[in-house]
Regions:
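Conserved short loop/turn motifs at secondary-structure junctions
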Residues: 1, 109-111, 188-193, 268-277, ...
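C-terminal helical "lid" subdomain and adjoining coupling/linker elements of P-loop NTPases
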Residues: 186-193, 205-248, 291, 315, ...
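C-terminal or mid-to-C-terminal helical accessory/interaction module adjacent to the motor/catalytic core
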Residues: 87, 100-101, 142-225, 268-272
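Amphipathic alpha-helical transducer elements in NTP-driven molecular machines
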Residues: 9-16, 33-36, 40, 59-62, ...
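Intrinsically disordered, low-complexity regulatory segments
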Residues: 1-169, 173-175, 473
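Metal- or metallocofactor-binding catalytic centers and their adjacent structured scaffolds
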Residues: 243-279, 285
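Basic, low-complexity terminal or inter-domain segments flanking catalytic cores
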Residues: 2, 81, 88, 125, ...
């Protein structure tokens, strides 16, 4: 018997149908010589410090550097304790039995670093010795699964990928555990969350936020001149920016007095805008956020769903290129789009004999090629799924179309010794931009409709005004700009080639960045204000401590990610990486233990353990190293006073506090209470009896 293990039940069912396994059992499907079973995500992970005999947060325990790591079934919290998830334990028992009976195992977990780790951790935990081979496919279509099963690869081909995944997992454990505990000790206990990837990401958001808020806008003035030729009016802007209104008005008077403006230079250039590269996951997430407001996690979830429904290829890809053999399939995929209503007309006009080859490069593909639609066309999709599907399908058509050609005109004009400029553009060939037929975003001041103008033209000054402007700070990060910053380890690169070159040295991977961002929301370090990412007071309190520490070094984190990529390709050995992480961890633990965090001990006793509570500018923390009680000062965007904090901790409830802010705007009044898990929650005063009576009467 052969055992096939998929990453989740839905994928297992698809594979079972292909291999003829139809007999459903508890935890697997069997038939035709196969047993098709599944994990459900990470069934096995690294044990917490308690399993190594290390309890509590104590200075003398740090740094915690296990000589070897203990694997355990996935844990769930019950009260203050963690225990093995019963469902996971049951499935591991089924896997143990199946693996023991198998002639060989076919590994069909996701074809990537994390998918490899999911299987290898299970295999190691079960102490299995059954030989295994790898099913490595880029889509879940029936054809792809059949071809993959006919070309199974030896399991040891992916040993380096596993070593990279294992090194990443252990590095995250070592850095996260030690950094969080060191900061907790330095802060007087409580629970703090730091991580190898999470904290530099937080630093990117916070640094931009503080820069934005500290920005002092400068006012300047520009002249806006109206002129015309042959009945076509247009406006031009002064190149000079005046630092005062009086200077601008004086220049304006000179221009009006001159009555004419002379064209001193006309430059016309043909601009060829090459088609964009195919999507990788990060680029898809960035554009879905900027165009539709989708979070990175939402885009990934939709893309994963489309993949599992066989409509697109493997989504967790970091490549924007396809190989020569995949390129041979593109004409058929374009032909397929003639049956998809939105793209039918355009796809029918494409000349598949002369397609752009900009995204075809064998050397720029690692595990998976760029995102593509499959041969399967969707018939019914909800609005959000349709958006993401059409982004992927539309991008394929754009990528293999011709360039967009424009004729750009740049004018320089002069009046009364003051220079003015204007820019116009005429579309010569729409090219790839005809796929979506969306307007090109241009800055209003940069584009104008120009008549036929030649150097030496003397044109009338039909009007001249002053425009008051202000310098602007760099905007707060959105998920789109944050993903771009993570991709390049904080470097701002607009050149596509430079961004591609930096990919292996970014923060996180395409598969993990959405989860990193969502962790920041889950831990209330960041909130969304429209599309902008705003750090909470909790987040700023952490950043104030770590901003100059190695744990927040964005470039260093990018270097670690590059090292992990080299382990996967065999260019670096995992033990060297591990030793480097241990040295780094020892350094950050020392730095954080020496951190000074201001706080004042109060007379308030901890409601959980009775030990003294320390009041800090952003929070109150219990001093007991084994307690970890933390109450944050800012609730509903309102900062609690020491008196309100003390009342909450001693009585379990405050009086009514006015001025909490709703997520959507507006304020409300409420009392605060501590629940049985010592979490803060709102308590609203009941409505008065007469109003309730009227409401009941209406019913």
């Amino acid at each position: 018997m052969q055992v096939i293990i998929a990453e989740k039940p839905s994928v297992a069912r698809e594979i079972a149908a292909i291999v003829g396994a139809t007999n459903r059992k508890d935890g697997f499907i069997e038939g035709n010589g196969y047993a098709v079973t599944w994990a459900f995500g990470h069934l096995v992970g690294l044990a917490m410090p308690q399993q190594y005999g290390i309890a509590g947060f104590r200075r003398e325990n740090l740094p915690i550097l296990p000589s070897s790591f203990i694997l355990l079934p996935r844990q769930v919290r019950e009260g203050k304790e963690y225990k093995a998830d019963p469902g996971v334990v049951k499935q591991l028992g089924i896997l143990r039995e199946l693996f023991g009976m198998a002639e060989r195992i076919i590994v069909a977990t996701d074809a990537g670093r994390e998918g490899e780790l999911i299987f290898r951790y299970i295999y190691s935990y079960l102490e299995c010795r059954t030989p295994f081979v790898r099913l490595w496919i880029s889509s879940l279509t029936d054809r792809a699964i059949r071809e993959g099963l006919q070309h199974l690869r030896p399991g040891n081909e992916y040993d380096n990928l596993y070593l990279s995944a294992k090194a990443r997992s252990e590095a995250d454990w070592i850095v996260g555990i030690n950094a969080s505990q060191a900061l907790a000790v330095a802060a007087g206990r409580g629970v703090w969350s730091l991580g190898r990837v999470q904290t530099p990401t937080l630093a990117i958001i916070c640094s931009r936020y503080l820069e934005n808020k500290a920005f002092k806008p400068a006012t300047y003035f520009r002249l806006k001149l109206s002129t015309a030729k042959e009945g076509t009016e247009f406006t031009v802007l002064s190149t000079e920016k005046f630092d005062g209104r009086e200077k601008a008005e004086a220049a304006r008077a000179e221009v009006i007095g001159a009555r004419t403006v002379r064209v001193v230079n006309v430059e016309r250039k043909e601009a060829r805008e090459q088609p964009p590269l195919l999507y990788d996951l990060t680029t898809l997430q960035k554009e879905a956020n900027s165009r539709y407001g989708f979070s990175a996690e939402k885009t990934l979830d939709i893309a994963q769903s489309l993949y599992e429904k066989k409509f697109i290829t493997y989504p967790r890809t970091g490549s924007r290129y396809i190989s020569e053999d995949v390129a041979e399939e593109i004409p058929a995929l374009i032909g397929n789009m003639t049956r998809y209503p939105r793209f039918a007309e355009y796809a029918g006009r494409m000349d598949t004999a002369s397609l752009s080859r900009r995204s075809v490069d064998n050397e720029k593909i690692a595990d998976h090629h760029a995102l593509l639609p499959t041969e399967n066309l969707p018939s019914e999709l909800d609005a959000d799924h349709r958006i993401v599907y059409e982004m992927v399908a539309g991008r394929m058509l754009e990528t293999f179309s011709g360039a967009c050609v424009k004729e750009n005109t740049f004018l320089t004009l002069q009046s009364a010794g003051h220079d003015f400029t204007a820019r116009g553009s005429i579309m010569v060939e729409t090219g790839w931009r005809a796929v979506l037929n969306e307007p090109v975003e241009e800055k209003e001041e940069d584009m104008t409709l120009l008549p036929d103008i030649v150097q030496g033209d003397e044109l009338p000054v039909k009007g001249c005004g002053t425009e008051q402007k202000q310098t602007r700070p760099r905007p707060l990060h959105t998920e789109s700009s944050l993903l771009a910053a993570m991709e390049t380890a904080g470097r701002e690169l607009s050149d596509e080639a430079e961004r591609e070159a930096m990919k292996d040295a970014g923060i996180g991977t395409p598969a993990t960045r959405a989860a990193i961002i969502e962790t920041l929301f889950a831990r209330e370090y960041v909130r969304r204000e429209k599309k902008s990412l705003v750090p909470t007071d909790k987040r700023l309190a952490v950043y104030a401590v770590v901003r100059d520490k190695k744990i927040a070094d964005v470039a260093m984190t990018g270097g670690w990610e590059l090292a992990l990529s080299k382990i996967a390709t065999g260019e670096m050995d995992a033990p060297t990486f591990h030793r480097g992480i241990e040295v780094f961890t020892s350094q950050i633990a020392k730095e954080l233990l020496e951190a000074r965090i201001d706080g004042a001990e109060s007379d308030t006793a901890c409601p959980r353990c009775g030990r003294p509570v320390v009041f800090y500018p952003k929070l109150a923390k219990c001093q007991n190293p084994d307690c970890g009680l933390t109450v944050w000062r800012t609730v509903g965007r309102k900062e609690l006073t020491d008196k309100q904090l003390a009342e909450l901790l001693t009585k379990g409830k405050t009086g009514t506090i006015r001025g909490f802010v709703k997520n959507g705007g507006g304020t409300f009044d409420a009392a605060l209470t501590l629940d049985d898990q010592f979490k803060t929650s709102f308590v609203f005063e009941p409505r008065d009896t007469p109003r309730q009576g009227k409401r009941n009467k209406r019913k």
